[in-house]
Amino acid sequence: MSYLNTENIARSKGGVEYHPLKPFLPEGAKILFLGSFPPQRKRWCIDFFYPNWINDHWRIQGQVFFGDKNHFVCEGEKRFKLDEIVRHCEEKGIAFFDTSTAVRRLKDNASDKFLEVVEPTDIAALTNQLPQLKAIVTTGEKATQTICATLGIPEVPKVNSYVAISSPPKGGRGGWSGEGALLWRLPSSSRAYPLSFEKKVEAYRKMFDAVLR
């Protein structure tokens, strides 16, 4: 199965990039990771979320759930095991998308600081498909600020903290009520973020234990 949004890829022109991936929303998902926007495709090693080989998201999940940071790494290759990642996320109820549906890159890199949001994601349309959602998780400043504005949360949570979500996104009809849900802000899995791998694992483990127990 392909997770590429070929229609969006085809219409990405004139400096505007539309999201190249379809939302990954497994049935019964309790956690929704929302980043800012994927890196350029030249940096991908898999056609899925957190596709950059030097981003440690899948190594962190490997360490948290299997005690092995290389659990999702293809031995001898610089890519991740996509089928195992998808199966794992479906079993655990972990969904993925981003807070922007279209962006303009102001510099030729993957930094959130140089992303201009052209079209924010319709968060209500996502959460309405996830009635069992217990936590929205962000790992970057831009994504956190965007989701706080969408949810009407006045104070942006600090890294390694969470706030209660008092109401679902505006425009939501049915589906997710937002009741009892939390917005968690975790440290970025990018190696550019100045925190040890072990400390990141500890932070992610705390969130997963709290939400999935």
Residue ranges of predicted features:
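C-terminal capping/extension of enzyme domains
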Residues: 1-23, 27-28, 39-41, 51-53, ...
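Short, conserved, surface-exposed binding loops centered on an aromatic residue
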Residues: 24, 86-89, 128-129
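Structural motif
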Residues: 30-31, 135
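Short hydrophobic-aromatic micro-motifs
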Residues: 32-34, 94-98, 183-184
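Short, well-ordered beta-to-alpha junction loops that form the rim of enzyme active sites
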Residues: 36-37, 138-143, 188
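Short, surface-exposed acidic-centric catalytic microdomains
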Residues: 42-115
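Short secondary-structure capping/junction motifs at helix and strand boundaries
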Residues: 70-71, 133-134, 155
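Internal catalytic-core helix/loop-beta-alpha segment
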Residues: 91-150
